[in-house]
């Protein structure tokens, strides 16, 4: 019983850590702190503790520290999960996903520091860390046996909801990548208005940065319409299943918050707190959609 309780605490701690890794990565990009330690990795300016620590260096060091702690925590969680709940069919798959993608995340992060990758490669960093977070999040739900609490094993889902959920989860990943590309290509303020690029002018983007920005907005708009439709379909037709009804209700709230913070990012000239909330909401939404995929795999 004590071991089970300790595993639950470890899984919660690791999930929160992974969330901080996500937000920390966004903070590094938004504050221009990616070069805070120069081209040195894992050292900072060639030293274990640099003598001069400006704000950018402090942010980069903090992100590296949290990422390193998360790597250790995920490794320990994976070992204990296989030992104590390895009999559950999803455990090993989620463990391999958690550990594999956090190592991939670390390697891409190191490569970005040492060899100055372009924006298209750097955008993968956020996406890969998102998969690792989602795997840890699902592993935590598995440890807490959330499915049993919501009677999720008794779900009967029609092919329509299954197809839409899988499609949404795949599509949102491309939306997230396009958003990360906006950050890394420094195209956040390429358009001065919202939702159009120029106020009152419905014209095509005029340069690369506007194309990056408007491509992300277009994909985000499609995602909003699609998820809204699926959420109301699920709440109307699956009201007897709390996990579906309230799960999609939360998903709808998160996508509304995501769109709102996206617009506010433009209106506030990329306010740091708004930008970090924007990254937080999409992380939570992606994790929730991945949970729906887990439910689909168990439903009749």
UniProtKB/Swiss-Prot annotation:
The chain crosses the membrane at residues 9-29, 65-85, 93-113, 124-144, 164-184, 219-239, 250-270, 276-296. The keyword Ribonucleoprotein does not apply. Its main location: membrane. Residues 30-64, 114-123, 185-218, 271-275 are extracellular. GO terms for biological process: heme A biosynthetic process. InterPro entries: COX15/CtaA_fam (IPR003780), COX15/CtaA_HemeA_synthase (IPR050450), HemeA_Synthase_type1 (IPR023755). It is found in: Cell membrane. Heme b binds at residues 216, 278. It is a multi-pass membrane protein. Pfam families: COX15-CtaA. Interacts with CtaB. Catalyzes the conversion of heme O to heme A by two successive hydroxylations of the methyl group at C8. The first hydroxylation forms heme I, the second hydroxylation results in an unstable dihydroxymethyl group, which spontaneously dehydrates, resulting in the formyl group of heme A. This is Heme A synthase.
